[in-house]
Curated annotation (Swiss-Prot), chains A, B:
GO terms for biological process: thiamine biosynthetic process; thiamine diphosphate biosynthetic process. One of its GO terms (molecular function) is ATP binding. Mg(2+) 2 binds at residues 52, 80. This is Thiamine-monophosphate kinase. The gene is thiL. Its EC number is 2.7.4.16.
């Protein structure tokens, strides 16, 4: 009788907010709504704005590493800017904190400032509050030329689908840390989990090339993000299992943990690579400019298909890493 | 040995972050740092950006009224824009939520969208997460002409100090609600507590007049905000008890609660009026354009003095509503 928000799941919850907002505001006012970041008209450019909130108990594999927590808070926001092909311009940090040791607090801030330096996005404002756990809310501000900005919509049947780097590494690292097992020999996966790097340069290359038809970042899992591009573009997608660039260490870590490596690559967030579409000739040009891995193609419709190593085609269910997931 | 952040208090904690950021970034890059909102260069204008985070258990006198919670989340952010004399342009909402009833969630969003409409700031983006309590993080975006923007710095000795409306009403309403007593007859104070209104129009009048030397909003209590203007301007302040425009109902509510009405007006947040300084001739002009109450004057230095009803001068301690307060 009294439905709860978990009965909808995160994506439908967001759609619910978006449709309410669209019913009230003009479509030119809410251009970026539903995309990775919001767009504000600033003359010849767009100001690109995004806000993401991270909680000590839910978003950090190791909450004993405050510097990494600060770094990651900036990175998840910068990754949304990267997904729009936008150049970072500044960062705002709102925190709510328990009564931390000053040394811990300073390390947290060092991580934030270190990341702000890395992304050339000065810390320009903020707010502090008290809370029972560490809550870190970031707002990233960037700029993009109006006709260059990357959106989720625009993929066309026949376009190729590509990712900017290996898949499943952040997921494998995160699961390894959470398992409490020895992480020796897997420093790269651990680093990718604790100190992910947003693909700002790659986003700028993609945007400035003018060759890309749609793009997003893989923070919620590849299949979920393909679903986003598909829904925004009104197309389908077909990907090939043997073209997925699984990270080198992913099979071994998955085996240690008794997990399916493909599941880590397809349905887990934390990769922070970009996934994008471009016509075949454009993709060819782009491959001379940057690392990219073509994993499939855009289809007319009918959801996401995967062709496995034996050539058998099956449908992928779009779930990804859904917070507030049903059931 | 291991100091905690509570040993510093909120203001010193913020100063600590600011001085770290200033040591790394150029001063032109971090113009608004320490002010009510951040400033981003956008040609002839500034983009004005602010982010505030509210928690179910700490910032809402009645967490059973989701629509009011949504409204207030937008308002506290808009109030920072008002303090800069900026026109709202958009709002971004990041939420982390427990598994709410859908009806409660919809009311929360109705409150957000209602407030966005009121302030003419479309909801342009957002993010959702799971959490154990309701966490609402807003980012407000506004615009201001470069030479018009209101800052905390700029007050000069001899300027007058004024506020845009009655003091202590939101505080009295909040304390009355929290006491669990009958609120009958005090609808105005209750409304001011649950559905405060940011002084956007007043901020725009002040900014466009070009007459104002410094300004901020009174979310953390009058004395605390006077301290902010003073510190940023390198001056002192003198205020007169008999000029403070205590809200009509404040003495009666204070008496019911056994509280000092003056304390509610001086040291409690929730008023959402603006406090500002201007030279005497400018203040005269402004008083023809809007409601304002002159409460004192800017002095050369020496902290905040209050002259009481008997003409006795004493020092006010700058504490206001400090989160993370020492001791």
């Amino acid at each position: 009788m009294h439905d709860r928000i978990s009965s909808l799941g995160e994506k439908k919850l967001i759609s619910r907010i978006i449709s309410r907002a669209r019913s009230v505001f003009g479509s030119s006012e809410v251009m970026g709504l539903g995309d990775d970041a919001a767009l504000i008209d600033a003359g010849e450019e767009f100001l690109v704005l995004t806000s993401d909130l991270l909680l000590e108990t839910r978003h950090f594999p190791d909450p004993e590493r405050p510097r990494d927590m600060g770094w990651k808070t900036v990175t998840v926001n910068m990754s949304d800017l990267a997904a729009m092909g936008s150049r970072p311009e500044g960062f705002i940090l709102s925190v709510a904190l328990p009564d931390l040791e000053l040394e811990f607090f300073d390390s947290l801030m060092d991580g934030v400032i270190e990341a702000c330096c890395h992304y050339q996005a000065p810390l320009i404002g903020g707010d502090t509050n008290e809370a029972d756990e560490i809550i870190l809310s970031g707002t990233a501000i960037g700029r993009a030329e109006k006709d260059m900005v990357l959106m989720k919509s625009g993929a066309r049947p026949g376009d190729l689908v590509a990712v900017t780097g290996p898949l499943g590494v952040g997921a494998a690292g995160t699961e390894l840390i959470l398992s409490g097992r020895d992480t020796g020999g897997f420093e790269n996966a651990v680093e990718r989990s604790l100190r992910p790097v947003a693909r700002i340069e790659e986003g700028l290359i993609l945007a400035e090339s003018g060759l890309v038809s749609s793009a997003t970042d893989i923070t919620d899992g590849l299949v979920s993000e393909l679903g986003e591009l598909m829904d925004a573009s009104g197309t389908g997608m077909r990907i090939y299992e043997d073209r997925l660039p699984l990270g080198r260490e992913v099979p071994e870590i998955a085996s240690i943990l008794g997990r399916d490596p493909l599941e880590l690559a397809l349905y887990y967030g934390e990769d922070f690579e970009l996934v994008f579409t471009a016509p075949p000739t454009g993709m060819e040009e782009l491959s001379d400019m940057m690392e990219l891995h073509v994993i499939g193609e855009v289809t007319v419709g009918g959801g996401i298909e995967m062709v496995d190593k034996d050539g058998v085609t099956y449908k992928l269910h779009v779930r990804g890493y859904e917070h507030l997931s049903p059931g």
